């Protein structure tokens, strides 16, 4: 929005042309989202407390969690508001990737909102029925896949890129839509599973989102993409604005979500943020790198799959409790130690992912 205004004002003063630079708009985007989160956060927390929108705690979970009962949830809406406002202010609203990503954010956020509302306001422990939940999540993921597939402007936009190797790309054809579906839905649910401790999910989300912004900046610049031998996707650079907004909003939310948390993200935040990571990775053709950088999300998801599979096949559990962060809690690890160690793992994995820019 402000980009249009700057372009108009540039005819009166050339200094306004500086707003065209993605780097400047990225910085302004992160600061705007951070400011909104700091400003709106206390207001939203107070409103949630007044309306008694508090988190219900499982009786069979770690006993240390019982003290968290009643902590306001659905705070992820704060992140979404900050991301959307910042993106609309500083993004190029004629860019298709901006609208596709915001569309995914809206659909997954809406599903998460309804699920949270039914659980904490209507006191329905089942939340949104699973069949309806996954129907609408599938609609959002498949819709994004179709939109990206049918608006692709070059063959590379629908190829699967293998990191660490030069010119290794697999033509996906129509299977690209299926891949997009699994990447978006898989990442969404993985982040949701990770969101079980104070600040555990949001910091890895910020780190991975920021790294994807670097890939978007490089991949959206023809010269950088050629030099680094990564896919050039025209227009992908605008994802830097969304990535920056995600980082700013996420850090602002972490201010209130850090241990001991004043507010929880809820499904409205976890499902939507995971989906945004997925769609950004698809757009910049870095799905495999997302799998590497989001290793904590993968570990949490695999731990649940192994736990369920083992119990059904043998009647025995591999972990004391799944997802795996609860396993460490029941082993006696303090919650802050688990959180920080998972953050450290994410930093390492993000650096490995960024190394693929040069190691080919």
Curated annotation (Swiss-Prot):
The keyword DNA-binding does not apply. GO terms for biological process: cell division; cell wall organization; peptidoglycan biosynthetic process; regulation of cell shape. Its EC number is 2.7.8.13. Coiled coil: none annotated. Keywords: Cell cycle, Cell division, Cell inner membrane, Cell membrane, Cell shape, Cell wall biogenesis/degradation, Magnesium, Membrane, Metal-binding, Peptidoglycan synthesis, Transferase, Transmembrane, Transmembrane helix. One of its GO terms (molecular function) is phospho-N-acetylmuramoyl-pentapeptide-transferase activity. The chain crosses the membrane at residues 27-47, 73-93, 97-117, 132-152, 164-184, 199-219, 236-256, 263-283, 288-308, 337-357. InterPro entries: Glycosyl_transferase_4 (IPR000715), PNAcMuramoyl-5peptid_Trfase (IPR003524), PNAcMuramoyl-5peptid_Trfase_CS (IPR018480). The keyword Chloroplast does not apply. It catalyses: UDP-N-acetyl-alpha-D-muramoyl-L-alanyl-gamma-D-glutamyl-meso-2,6-diaminopimeloyl-D-alanyl-D-alanine + di-trans,octa-cis-undecaprenyl phosphate = di-trans,octa-cis-undecaprenyl diphospho-N-acetyl-alpha-D-muramoyl-L-alanyl-D-glutamyl-meso-2,6-diaminopimeloyl-D-alanyl-D-alanine + UMP. It is an enzyme of class 2 (transferase). Its cofactor is Mg(2+). It comes from the Bacteria. GO terms for cellular component: plasma membrane. Pathway: Cell wall biogenesis; peptidoglycan biosynthesis. It is a multi-pass membrane protein. It holds the Pfam family MraY_sig1. It is found in: Cell inner membrane. HAMAP family: MraY. Belongs to the glycosyltransferase 4 family. MraY subfamily. Catalyzes the initial step of the lipid cycle reactions in the biosynthesis of the cell wall peptidoglycan: transfers peptidoglycan precursor phospho-MurNAc-pentapeptide from UDP-MurNAc-pentapeptide onto the lipid carrier undecaprenyl phosphate, yielding undecaprenyl-pyrophosphoryl-MurNAc-pentapeptide, known as lipid I. This is Phospho-N-acetylmuramoyl-pentapeptide-transferase. It comes from Alcanivorax borkumensis (strain ATCC 700651 / DSM 11573 / NCIMB 13689 / SK2).
């Amino acid at each position: 929005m402000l980009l249009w205004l700057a372009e108009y004002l540039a005819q009166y003063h050339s200094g306004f042309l500086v707003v065209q630079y993605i780097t400047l708009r990225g910085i302004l985007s992160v600061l705007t989202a951070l400011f909104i989160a700091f400003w709106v956060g206390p207001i939203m927390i107070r409103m949630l407390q007044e309306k008694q929108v508090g988190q219900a705690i499982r009786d069979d979970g770690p006993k240390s969690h019982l003290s968290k009962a009643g902590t306001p949830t659905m705070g992820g809406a704060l992140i979404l508001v900050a991301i959307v406002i910042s993106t609309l202010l500083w993004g190029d609203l004629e860019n298709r990737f901006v609208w596709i990503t915001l569309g995914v954010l809206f659909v997954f956020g809406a599903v998460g909102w309804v699920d949270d509302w039914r659980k904490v306001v209507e006191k329905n422990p089942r939340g949104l029925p699973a069949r309806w939940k996954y129907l609408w999540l599938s609609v959002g993921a498949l819709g994004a896949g179709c939109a990206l597939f049918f608006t692709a402007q070059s063959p590379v936009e629908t190829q699967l890129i293998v990191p660490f190797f030069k010119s290794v790309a697999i033509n996906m054809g129509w299977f690209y839509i299926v891949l997009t579906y699994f990447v978006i839905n898989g990442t969404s649910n993985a982040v949701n599973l990770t969101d079980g401790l104070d600040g555990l999910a949001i910091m890895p989300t910020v780190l991975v989102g920021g790294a994807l912004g670097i890939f978007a900046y490089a991949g959206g610049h023809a010269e950088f993409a050629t030099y680094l031998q990564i896919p050039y996707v025209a227009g992908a650079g605008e994802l830097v604005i969304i990535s920056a907004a995600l980082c700013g909003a996420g850090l602002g939310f972490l201010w209130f979500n850090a241990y001991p948390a004043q507010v929880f993200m809820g499904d409205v935040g976890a499902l939507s943020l995971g989906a945004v990571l997925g769609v950004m990775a698809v757009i910049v053709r870095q799905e495999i790198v997302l799998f590497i950088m989001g290793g904590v999300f993968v570990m949490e998801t695999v731990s649940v799959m192994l736990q369920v599979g083992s119990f059904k096949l043998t009647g025995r559990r591999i972990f004391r409790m799944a997802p795996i962060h609860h396993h460490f809690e029941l082993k006696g690890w303090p919650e802050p130690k688990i959180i920080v160690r998972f953050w450290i793992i994410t930093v390492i994995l993000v650096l490995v992912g960024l190394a693929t820019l040069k190691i080919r």
